[in-house]
Design a protein with these regions (language model features):
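N-terminal carbohydrate-binding accessory modules
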Residues: 25-32, 198-199, 271-291
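Accessory beta-strand-rich segments of carbohydrate-active enzymes
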Residues: 26, 43-47, 61, 82, ...
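Beta-strand-rich binding/interaction modules
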Residues: 121, 207-242, 248-250, 270-272
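Short, aromatic- and glycine-rich surface loops/edge beta-strands on solvent-exposed regions
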Residues: 152-155, 264-276
C-alpha cells in the first residue's frame, strides 16, 4: 500500500464522530481547581474543628478551610518540638456513574494529596497506601463500582507520612505544612481493550517516537498516529501491527514542522488510535506535543 493511500485511509477512519465515540470519558468527583470546588464530608483528628464531621471544599488545603493546625516547615530546628501537625483527615462523598460504563475499564485518579493516602470505594480498599504529595496516582476500580446507582468514596489522609524519607523530602522544608486533597479527583472510563498511556519523544528535526502502553490487546489490533496541523503530504508513517505485548513503539518523521522555542512555542496535537481487525477505532488518545 502506498504511503499516500495509507494516510488517506487513516484520515478517513479518524473522523470526528468516530473519535468522540472512542475517546476516554472523564467524570470529576471534585472540582477542577480552587475557583471550582465540590463539597465533601470531612473530619480531622486534631487541631481546629477536629473530632466531628463537617464539610470541606475539594480540592483545597484543609488548613485554609479552617481545620487542623498551621505549622512552619522548619519546626525541626527548634528545640523541644517533635512532629507537630500530626493530623489525619477523612473525606467522604457519594456519587453516581452511568450504567453504560459497565464493561469498560474504570480508573480513579487523584492528582495530588498531601501526604499518605488510603482510598476505599463502597467500603472496599482500592489499593495500597500512596505515599508522597506531589504527583498523581490511580487505582483500577472497575470491580468496585455499582453501575447506574449510588457509590461512596472514602479517602483517608495523613498529613505526615509513615515513610521517613518522604517526610525528609516533603515535610522538613522552608514552607508552611499543609494537608489534604489539594488537586482534582476524577474517574476515567475506557474500553476494556485500550491505550493506557503514551510516552512521547519528539525531536526538533521532526523525528517522533511514541511508546504506547496498552491493556487487554490480543495481537489482532493495529496502531496509527496523526499529528495536526501537520498535513498528510508532509508525514512519513507506516501502520504498526500490535503484538500481544503491552508496550508498542511507533516511529515517524514529519517534514516542515516548527520547532518549539521560547519565542515561538508551537504546539501540535498527537492522536494515537488503537484499531480493531476490521479497521474500526477501538480507542484513541490525544495529547499536545512540541518538537
Amino acid at each position: 500500500m502506498s504511503r499516500k493511500h495509507f494516510l488517506t485511509t487513516v484520515l478517513f477512519l479518524l473522523t470526528t464522530c468516530l473519535l468522540q465515540a472512542q475517546e476516554t470519558e472523564r467524570q470529576y468527583l471534585s472540582g477542577t481547581g480552587l475557583d471550582n470546588t465540590v463539597t465533601w464530608q470531612f473530619r480531622v483528628s486534631e487541631g481546629r474543628n477536629s473530632g466531628r464531621w463537617s464539610k470541606i471544599e475539594v480540592p483545597s488545603q484543609w488548613e485554609l478551610q479552617g481545620f487542623g493546625e498551621y505549622t512552619y516547615g522548619r519546626w525541626y530546628k527548634k528545640p523541644g518540638i517533635k512532629n507537630p501537625s500530626m493530623e489525619e483527615g477523612t473525606y467522604k462523598r457519594s456519587f453516581r456513574i452511568p450504567r453504560n460504563w459497565q464493561g469498560r475499564n474504570i480508573r480513579l485518579w487523584l492528582d495530588g494529596v498531601m501526604t499518605d493516602t488510603e482510598v476505599f470505594v463502597n467500603g472496599q480498599s482500592a489499593g495500597p497506601v500512596h505515599q508522597g504529595g506531589f504527583y498523581r496516582f490511580s487505582y483500577d476500580v472497575t470491580d468496585l463500582l455499582k453501575y447506574g446507582s449510588s457509590n461512596q468514596i472514602e479517602v483517608r489522609v495523613k498529613k505526615h507520612s509513615d515513610n521517613r524519607t518522604v517526610n525528609a523530602a516533603e515535610r522538613k522544608a522552608d514552607w508552611w505544612l499543609f494537608g489534604g486533597i489539594y488537586r482534582p479527583v476524577w474517574l476515567e472510563a475506557k474500553p476494556a481493550v485500550h491505550i493506557e498511556r503514551l510516552a512521547v519523544d519528539a525531536r526538533a528535526d521532526g523525528e517522533l517516537k511514541v511508546e504506547v502502553h496498552l491493556q487487554g490487546v490480543t495481537g489482532e489490533e493495529s496502531l496509527s498516529m496523526e499529528v495536526s496541523p501537520v498535513s498528510a503530504k508532509d508525514a512519513e508513517h507506516r501502520p504498526v501491527k500490535v503484538t500481544a505485548d503491552s508496550v508498542q513503539l511507533l516511529t515517524a518523521h514529519f517534514d516542515g514542522i516548527s520547532p518549539w522555542t521560547p519565542e515561538s512555542p508551537t504546539l501540535y496535537r498527537l492522536t494515537v488510535s488503537l484499531l480493531g481487525k476490521a479497521g474500526n477505532v477501538i480507542h484513541s488518545m490525544n495529547t499536545r506535543i512540541g518538537f
